[in-house]
């Protein structure tokens, strides 16, 4: 492998090899450069190298080389310049397509040339033997050999590009474009096998995308752009599948689209949904699924009516007619199902899946056939107004088949309606996404439905009818067709009848007791036997028994009812227990099954991974060996050719041939050949120089002579052209003079007309200018008046705002003065109260001091009689403050007394406290603790407190003054109250 310092050198080397006809060597040189680890950063020359590389790959049909190169180039520019990769891939696809088109244009018999079932399959041995034996050398064979290889290469190109671009968020648009081109290739050349493989490839890519969610640069399907690209690709797939007639693949495409919609939980655009349901109608009609076909048409009608604003009334009527006819085409009976549980489950799963595809989300616990049925659809068409939008013929047909009873003339009523319907249809002008509507496709199904309705109605009025009469009632079919239809109806329990060809009659009614009629027959037979027995053996009278039973009947019924309720509850409980056990067993079995399945899957994945790794390893080793062997063979062949050409000695037979020895020998030979070639080229260049010099010497006089002849010819041509131009100029001048003379006589009229026009336009101009000036002056006056009015309004508003502002300021000042006055009054009141409290406190201190001195005198035990306390004088309330002030002034200073000790009432004060002061003092609670109860001082104070309380509570007791100075015993008790010391002896 040659190592190039710059990529441009490799490109130049490839061009040199191409010029000498060695395209394979040029391709190998570029391949070595692209796959080299030296050039892992993107450069602009690499893009040109890729263009040249792909040109060589296409010319030599080397798809594998192209794939390797594109993979390496994707690694190089994926994170740097994705647009370069897009250009390279587009160039590759363009080259392959052009080559295929060229081959196609060269083939005259295209149909025979393309008559190949599988592009990837080789020719059959039988075809090869036949061509050899028959000596086929004609044009068909040459066309096949010319066109088919290029189509095969183009198909491999599409596969390669899709494999390179798959599951990459940066290459989604290019992936979608490539898939679209591949679909168009399959569509254009009717490649059904390749189309199936292409669908499977795209399906596997999406499955791998969902499987490996941690992949780098993985597309995000929740993004609107990515989802739209994937949906567009699937819709292209669906369209091509229907156009190619691959209905099974079309149905799988529908499932792919539904899977995408479920995966991202987002509804596509209405235009895509219309295409989706239109293709569903075609698929279900081809598969004879008339029920789902009708529901798909109903969905399509709803979408067109709700989202297509340009839908004309004619198109709406045609779509509604299609919906109604599709619903009527559904067979009026359900197909009989087998009793196999597996088949029933499969049918239920199929119905559920079909309902989901159509857009009806059913619960798995409900049967799909119960939710999606002919009767439900017809009632919904009537309730949603679809029938009212249909044509009159369809409405009449609906009423005749579904609501009316005409057993004898049903065929004659329906036949003209079907003829009119078969002529209706056409392309929808306002709904281009929908296929062409042909109502005639429903006529056979409607004829079959009419036959079934006729048989059903005839069976209700006849028990036996002749075959000829029945054939006359059914104008659509021969009796053999009617018989086939009736067999299907009898099989599905729609009508009960039997055809007797020997008698030529048709018998209606329940004709046997087998199958489902056995149960009813036995019941009727048992009932008849019971009646006969009752007639033969009448029941004896039971009046006497009833007389004894009736009184206890209510209790018996109540007991029986309770017993039945208890039995019912027991049964329900047992059922619940059984169901719970069954659910538990099923849950355990499901867990075991899931666990076993998980283990099996893990083991299978490990085995597959090991096999894949082993296969990959073997494949790599095999490829390396094959590549080395091919290189050795190529080198050996090239060496042998050169030896033969140069008549050199070949390798000996006994000599060991290895790759290394062949390479060394080949390199030696190449070096020698290169030296010889350089010598030959030098000699050839010298010879060519001599020849070129001689040729130029001989050609010089000839060139000079030709130049002189050319000068003479040019001079003559110039003179002729000059003379012709002068003559033409003279002719034009003469014609202009004649034209001037002809027009000069009209000069006066022209001036008169000009003056008239100017005067008229001047007058009109003056009038318009005057009107304009008046209009402008009027506008100026109006604007001035408006400005004056606006100024006055602004002035008035300012004055009013100023007045309101002054009023507000005055009001605020007044409020502020009032608040200050109230504050001052409150302050004076508080000051007066404080003075009154201070005077009261001083008086209390004085009284307490006086009482203390008296107690001390009493405790000394002197013989002098105790000083009698002065009688308190009662002063009016209004004189409280002056008296308190006088007492405070005359009293000496005393120590501070706490507030809780200030509750005694002064006995020597000149006046009593006011009511407010009394309330305030009475609200004070007793002091905390028990100290004032255990001391002499506390005893005295408590005595005074009790005395004060008696004074407040009422007048003093008889025999003593109001201060309690009564008998001696009372004084003793009062003086010793609350004291722990012994009382002194009184004399």
UniProtKB/Swiss-Prot annotation:
<keyword id="KW-0963">Cytoplasm</keyword>
<comment type="function">
    <text>RNA-binding component of the eukaryotic translation initiation factor 3 (eIF-3) complex, which is involved in protein synthesis of a specialized repertoire of mRNAs and, together with other initiation factors, stimulates binding of mRNA and methionyl-tRNAi to the 40S ribosome. The eIF-3 complex specifically targets and initiates translation of a subset of mRNAs involved in cell proliferation.</text>
</comment>
<keyword id="KW-0396">Initiation factor</keyword>
<keyword id="KW-0648">Protein biosynthesis</keyword>
<feature type="compositionally biased region" description="Basic and acidic residues">
    <location>
        <begin position="808"/>
        <end position="859"/>
    </location>
</feature>
<dbReference type="InterPro" id="IPR054711">
    <property type="entry name" value="eIF3a_PCI_TPR-like"/>
</dbReference>
<dbReference type="GO" id="GO:0033290">
    <property type="term" value="C:eukaryotic 48S preinitiation complex"/>
</dbReference>
<dbReference type="GO" id="GO:0005852">
    <property type="term" value="C:eukaryotic translation initiation factor 3 complex"/>
</dbReference>
<keyword id="KW-0175">Coiled coil</keyword>
<dbReference type="GO" id="GO:0005829">
    <property type="term" value="C:cytosol"/>
</dbReference>
<feature type="coiled-coil region">
    <location>
        <begin position="797"/>
        <end position="858"/>
    </location>
</feature>
<dbReference type="GO" id="GO:0016282">
    <property type="term" value="C:eukaryotic 43S preinitiation complex"/>
</dbReference>
<feature type="coiled-coil region">
    <location>
        <begin position="93"/>
        <end position="122"/>
    </location>
</feature>
<comment type="subunit">
    <text>Component of the eukaryotic translation initiation factor 3 (eIF-3) complex. Binds to the translation initiation factor TIF3H1.</text>
</comment>
<dbReference type="InterPro" id="IPR027512">
    <property type="entry name" value="EIF3A"/>
</dbReference>
<dbReference type="InterPro" id="IPR000717">
    <property type="entry name" value="PCI_dom"/>
</dbReference>
<dbReference type="GO" id="GO:0003743">
    <property type="term" value="F:translation initiation factor activity"/>
</dbReference>
<dbReference type="Pfam" id="PF22591">
    <property type="entry name" value="eIF3a_PCI_TPR-like"/>
</dbReference>
<feature type="region of interest" description="Disordered">
    <location>
        <begin position="808"/>
        <end position="987"/>
    </location>
</feature>
<feature type="compositionally biased region" description="Polar residues">
    <location>
        <begin position="976"/>
        <end position="987"/>
    </location>
</feature>
<dbReference type="GO" id="GO:0006413">
    <property type="term" value="P:translational initiation"/>
</dbReference>
<comment type="similarity">
    <text>Belongs to the eIF-3 subunit A family.</text>
</comment>
<feature type="compositionally biased region" description="Low complexity">
    <location>
        <begin position="872"/>
        <end position="894"/>
    </location>
</feature>
<dbReference type="GO" id="GO:0001732">
    <property type="term" value="P:formation of cytoplasmic translation initiation complex"/>
</dbReference>
<dbReference type="GO" id="GO:0003729">
    <property type="term" value="F:mRNA binding"/>
</dbReference>
<keyword id="KW-0694">RNA-binding</keyword>
<dbReference type="Pfam" id="PF01399">
    <property type="entry name" value="PCI"/>
</dbReference>
<feature type="domain" description="PCI">
    <location>
        <begin position="316"/>
        <end position="513"/>
    </location>
</feature>
<protein>
    <recommendedName>
        <fullName>Eukaryotic translation initiation factor 3 subunit A</fullName>
    </recommendedName>
</protein>
<feature type="coiled-coil region">
    <location>
        <begin position="556"/>
        <end position="742"/>
    </location>
</feature>
<feature type="compositionally biased region" description="Polar residues">
    <location>
        <begin position="905"/>
        <end position="916"/>
    </location>
</feature>
């Amino acid at each position: 492998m040659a190592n190039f310092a710059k990529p441009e050198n490799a490109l130049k080397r490839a061009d040199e090899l191409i010029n000498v006809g060695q395209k394979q060597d040029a391709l190998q040189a570029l391949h070595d450069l692209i796959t080299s680890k030296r050039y892992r950063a993107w450069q602009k020359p690499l893009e040109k190298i890729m263009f040249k590389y792909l040109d060589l790959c296409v010319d030599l049909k080397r798809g594998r080389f192209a794939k390797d190169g594109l993979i390496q180039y994707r690694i190089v520019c994926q994170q740097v310049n994705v647009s370069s990769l897009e250009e390279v891939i587009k160039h590759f696809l363009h080259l392959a397509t052009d080559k295929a088109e060229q081959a196609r244009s060269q083939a005259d018999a295209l149909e025979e040339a393309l008559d190949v079932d599988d592009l990837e399959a080789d020719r059959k041995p039988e075809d090869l033997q036949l061509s050899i034996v028959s000596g086929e050398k004609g044009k068909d064979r040459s066309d096949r050999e010319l066109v088919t290889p290029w189509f095969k290469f183009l198909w491999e190109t599409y596969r390669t590009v899709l494999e390179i671009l798959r599951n990459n968020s940066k290459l989604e648009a290019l992936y979608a474009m490539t898939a679209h081109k591949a679909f168009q290739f399959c569509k254009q050349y009717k490649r059904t096998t390749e189309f199936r493989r292409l669908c499977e490839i795209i399906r596997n890519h999406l499955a791998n995308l969902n499987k490996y969610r941690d992949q780098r640069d993985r597309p995000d399907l929740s993004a609107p752009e990515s989802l739209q690209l994937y949906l567009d690709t699937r819709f292209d797939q669906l369209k091509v599948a229907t156009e190619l007639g691959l209905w099974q693949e079309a149905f799988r495409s529908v499932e792919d689209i539904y899977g995408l919609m479920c995966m991202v939980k987002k509804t596509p655009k209405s235009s895509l949904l219309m295409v989706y349901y239109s293709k569903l109608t075609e698929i279900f009609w081809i598969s004879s699924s008339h029920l789902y076909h009708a529901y798909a048409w109903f969905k399509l009608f709803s979408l067109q009516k709700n989202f297509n604003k340009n839908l004309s009334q004619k198109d709406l009527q045609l779509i509604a007619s299609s919906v109604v006819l599709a619903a009527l085409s559904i067979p009026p009976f359900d197909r009989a199902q087998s009793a196999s549980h597996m088949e029933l489950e499969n049918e239920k799963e199929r119905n559920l899946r079909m309902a989901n595809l159509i857009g009806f989300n059913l619960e798995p616990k409900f049967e799909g056939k119960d939710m999606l049925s002919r009767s439900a659809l017809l009632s919904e068409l009537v309730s949603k107004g679809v029938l009212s939008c249909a044509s009159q013929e369809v409405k009449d047909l609906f009423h005749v088949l579904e609501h009316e009873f005409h057993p004898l003339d049903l065929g004659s009523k329906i036949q003209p309606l079907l003829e009119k319907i078969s002529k209706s249809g056409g392309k929808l002008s306002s709904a281009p996404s929908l296929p062409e509507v042909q109502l005639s496709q429903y006529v056979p199904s409607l004829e079959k439905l009419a036959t079934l309705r006729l048989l059903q109605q005839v069976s209700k009025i006849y028990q036996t009818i002749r075959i000829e009469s029945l054939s006359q009632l059914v104008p659509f079919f021969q009796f053999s067709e009617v018989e086939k239809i009736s067999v299907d109806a009898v099989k599905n329990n729609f009508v009960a009848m039997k055809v007797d060809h020997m008698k030529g009659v048709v018998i209606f009614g329940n004709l046997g007791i087998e199958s489902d009629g056995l149960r009813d027959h036995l019941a009727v037979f048992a009932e008849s036997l019971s009646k006969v027995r009752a007639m033969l053996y009448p029941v004896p009278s039971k009046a006497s028994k009833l007389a004894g039973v009736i009184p206890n009947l209510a209790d018996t019924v109540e007991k029986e009812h309770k017993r039945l309720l208890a039995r019912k509850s027991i049964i329900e409980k047992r059922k619940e227990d059984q169901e719970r056990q069954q659910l538990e067993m099923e849950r355990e079995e499901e867990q075991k099954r899931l666990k076993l399945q998980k283990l099996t899957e893990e083991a299978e994945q490990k085995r597959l991974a090991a096999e894949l790794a082993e296969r990959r390893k073997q494949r790599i080793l095999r490829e390396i060996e094959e590549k080395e062997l091919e290189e050795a063979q190529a080198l050996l062949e090239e060496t042998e050719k050169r030896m033969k050409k140069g008549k050199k000695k070949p390798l000996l037979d006994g000599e060991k041939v290895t790759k290394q020895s062949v390479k060394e020998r080949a390199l030696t030979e190449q070096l020698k050949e290169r030296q010889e070639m350089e010598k030959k080229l030098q000699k050839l260049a010298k010879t060519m120089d001599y020849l070129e010099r001689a040729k130029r010497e001989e050609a010089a006089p000839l060139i000079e002579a030709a130049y002189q002849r050319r000068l003479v010819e040019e001079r003559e041509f110039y003179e002729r052209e000059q003379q012709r131009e002068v003559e033409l100029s003279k002719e034009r001048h003469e014609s202009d003079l004649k034209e001037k003379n002809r027009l000069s006589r009209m000069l006066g009229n022209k001036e008169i007309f000009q003056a008239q026009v100017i005067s008229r336009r001047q007058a009109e101009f003056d009038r318009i200018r005057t009107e304009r000036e008046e209009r402008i002056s009027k506008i100026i006056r109006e604007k001035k008046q408006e400005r004056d009015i606006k100024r006055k309004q602004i002035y008035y508003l300012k004055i009013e705002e100023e007045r309101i502002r002054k009023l507000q300021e005055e009001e605020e000042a007044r409020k502020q003065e009032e608040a200050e006055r109230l504050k001052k009054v409150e302050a004076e009141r508080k000051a007066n109260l404080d003075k009154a409290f201070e005077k009261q406190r001083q008086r209390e201190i004085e009284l307490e001091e006086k009482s203390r001195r008296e107690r001390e005198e009493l405790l000394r035990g002197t013989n002098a009689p105790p000083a009698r306390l002065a009688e308190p004088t009662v002063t009016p309330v209004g004189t409280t403050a002056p008296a308190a002030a006088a007492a405070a002034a005359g009293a000496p200073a005393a120590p501070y007394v706490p507030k809780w000790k200030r509750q005694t009432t002064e006995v020597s004060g000149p006046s009593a406290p006011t009511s407010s002061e009394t309330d305030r003092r009475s609200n004070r609670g007793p002091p905390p603790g028990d100290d004032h109860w255990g001391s002499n001082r506390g005893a005295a104070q408590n005595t005074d407190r009790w005395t004060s309380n008696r004074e407040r509570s009422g007048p003093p007791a008889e025999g003593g003054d109001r201060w309690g100075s009564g008998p001696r015993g009372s004084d003793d008790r009062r003086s010793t109250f609350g004291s722990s010391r012994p009382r002194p002896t009184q004399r």
